[in-house]
Structure formats: C-alpha cells, structure tokens
C-alpha cells in the first residue's frame, strides 16, 4: 500500500512518539516503510478485527440492539486537509447515527485498557478530528481471555 502523500492515523502516533524524522524519510520516499506482512501482532489484529467488531456489537452496554447495529458501518475512510497537510484515516467502525467511531485492537493478555488508551490516543484523536466525531470507542481483545471497551472523548 502506498502511504506517501498524506498523514495517517499510525503516522500521528509515530509523530507523538518522536519518530517524526523516520516518518518523514518514508513519506518522502527516502526510506522504505517497514513490511508488516510477517509481523504476527499486526496480522493477528487484522485477522481478529471482524470478530472484535462483532463482539463489540453484542456486548457493549447500550449497543447490542439491532437498531444500533444497523447504524454502524465498518471500514470507513475519512480525508481532510488540515493546515495544508493532506490527512487520511480509515476507522474500523463508524456509528453514523451518533457520529462516533470504533477502533479495534488486539493486545497481550496482561496489558491494561489504560495503557492501550495512552498508546493509541494520538491515533484516536486524529481519527476523531478527521471524522468530526465526538467519541471513539476503543474495543480491545486482551490475549484470548478478556475483552474491554471504553469511550474516549475528543
């Protein structure tokens, strides 16, 4: 996938972590992006994303009704130019009846929701800005033992 020419959600995280120079090298074609096709953590997250969305729909308080499920679209891409910088992000789910987004993650079993929120906050805030959303639900599978979801406000 060509990720040059715009800033994305993962890029926002890298910028906030201080990896902006390497990101700039990649975005300008001076360096190659890492190939994540053999990264098991990344691929497991991709593979379990649909299950994570299904679990969120079934178990999130106030969300399991068919009415709400019908108001959710998976994999929506938002684009905007912010301060003359092209930005693009694809959210895992968009709850269009409430203008809220869903981001799904799969992490190790001893991780905490607080740590996940901290780790992904730049990506979440970036997506909320692009989607003009008021909230983002972070739905996280921890290993194979537990699941949690939490709402993050703009």
Question: In which residue ranges do the predicted regions lie?
Answer:
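Charged, glycine-rich intrinsically disordered N-terminal tails and low-complexity linkers that flank
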Residues: 1-54, 59
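Nucleic-acid nuclease catalytic cores
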Residues: 58-154
